[in-house]
């Protein structure tokens, strides 16, 4: 895992990122555009063996020219680590060994609720919403990082101009 400033420096060029919502049974995946402005839901991977998961993620990374991974870190509302935080950290460590070192953990507070609320376009069909919830949560996590990145870049450009 990288410090956020180091991560940002390594992904500066036009490149795509993936966002991962690590869940107990399923893992949501979202992908950004090359300019790192918009996150789009991509897929949901059913948790099986780690080797199968790594194969699936490697394929996504290679086929989509991914340069960095943003993993949702499920922390409590008060900022303290949740029970699932260690699982997210372990996943980040393993992915950094198996795929790329360009990985950060990103605060995912309220991502599942936000994703569920934003899925209103699926109508009142709750089973459809639940089916898409993981990849929508990954989109919510990745979009949060992209928005942060955009604000950071805007602020940096403003300061340079002074």
Residue ranges and their predicted role:
Residues 1-18, 25, 30-162:
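Phosphate- and other anionic-substrate recognition elements at nucleic-acid/protein interfaces
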């Amino acid at each position: 895992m990288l410090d956020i400033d180091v991560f940002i420096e390594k992904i500066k060029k036009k490149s795509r990122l993936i966002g991962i919502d690590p869940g107990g049974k399923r893992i949501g995946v979202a992908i950004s555009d090359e300019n790192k402005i918009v996150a789009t839901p991509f897929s949901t991977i059913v948790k099986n063996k780690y080797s199968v998961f790594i194969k699936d993620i490697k394929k996504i990374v290679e086929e989509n020219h991914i340069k960095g991974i943003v993993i949702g870190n499920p922390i409590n509302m008060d900022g303290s680590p949740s029970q699932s935080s260690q699982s997210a950290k372990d996943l980040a460590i393993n992915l950094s060994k198996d795929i790329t070192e360009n990985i950060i953990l990103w605060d995912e507070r309220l991502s599942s609720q936000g994703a569920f609320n934003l899925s209103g376009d699926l109508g009142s069909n709750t089973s459809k919403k639940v089916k898409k919830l993981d990849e929508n949560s990954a989109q919510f996590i990745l979009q949060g990082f992209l928005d942060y990145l955009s604000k950071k870049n805007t602020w940096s450009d403003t300061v340079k101009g002074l």
